[in-house]
């Protein structure tokens, strides 16, 4: 779709030091954006005390963030469709930088919320362009590996970024944590401007983007997006209350609870590079295996939730289910986004934008449904997650053609 200068060598040497550096910059962009997005999670109490508001009110920052991102993604992606891809990415990172600076200096909750809105507006734009940029840096046969390299940054944000900002908020205050994120975002924006090719669209490519795009009429893309929304909803129904699940369902408490949470994140970090090659060579099989594992993990946790006693065996089984959940929830995301981009044809950015919107709707729906079911019982909440994952798995199984890679020969997929 684009013609970046100086990338012709990638057809023969896809993993040159230059390409590795460019992909690393993209991973850093994903890392800093996700770290900024979830910064309030580890600083809820600190923000509430400092701004003299309730913890519940601070918690709504995450819900409003997802809502703004869901509403603005598709219009913003269409409006910027004619921009060079590097410009769209850098503008997103600059907006992130400004939003974090506004947050750090916010005198009250309203200003803090306004800063978060600015960050949320360009959230969808960044996630719509970052994976397509990565795939354009390498040959089509390496697109899956390029996409998963970005998700390493996402996993690191959960394993390193969020705990680090939480610790900084506790020790030195949440404003300093926001200042550090501001500086890191500015550095990544500069690195992206210097390291990435401009990626200007050709005249013939402009015919398929922006207002001319008809992704909502693309049945293949719509199906991928709907299945994504169902799966993400199933995940977030329970993920919001994962600490409670570990404590009351698995039966792990105290310091071991923190270690199991860390294992959840590390499992996701490890799984991403492991699925990179299968995603390129066997995309259909990879996504089915991933969704089967997620469904099994939630089914096992549901069975444990209906049990009445905690034993060493149930703790061991529950621990395995939590780790499997962490590994596959992270691994499946690049699989689904890759399928969405392939479905978009000549406009992978626009297709990715629709995918991001579906993802954000899934986050909101999952959090809302999870809150309603949590008030009734953990068992019902986990049953809903298992059921939604099962529905998504069934849909993906009967529609495996959605995940085919057209660059592969029939024997490869």
From Swiss-Prot:
The chain crosses the membrane at residues 23-43, 55-75, 89-109, 110-130, 150-170, 176-196, 226-246, 256-276, 286-306, 312-332, 353-373, 378-398. It comes from the Bacteria. InterPro entries: MFS, MFS_dom, MFS_Efflux_Transporters, MFS_trans_sf. It is found in: Cell membrane. Keywords: Antibiotic resistance, Cell membrane, Membrane, Transmembrane, Transmembrane helix, Transport. PROSITE patterns: MFS. One of its GO terms (cellular component) is plasma membrane. Induction: Expression is negatively regulated by the transcriptional repressor Rv1353c. The keyword Oxidoreductase does not apply. Its main location: membrane. It is a multi-pass membrane protein. Inhibited by the drug efflux pump inhibitors verapamil, resperine, piperine, chlorpromazine and carbonyl cyanide m-chlorophenylhydrazone (CCCP). GO terms for biological process: response to antibiotic; transmembrane transport. Pfam families: MFS_1 (PF07690). GO terms for molecular function: transmembrane transporter activity. Active efflux pump that plays an important role in chloramphenicol resistance. Overexpression causes pyrazinamide resistance. Belongs to the major facilitator superfamily. This is Chloramphenicol efflux pump Rv0191.
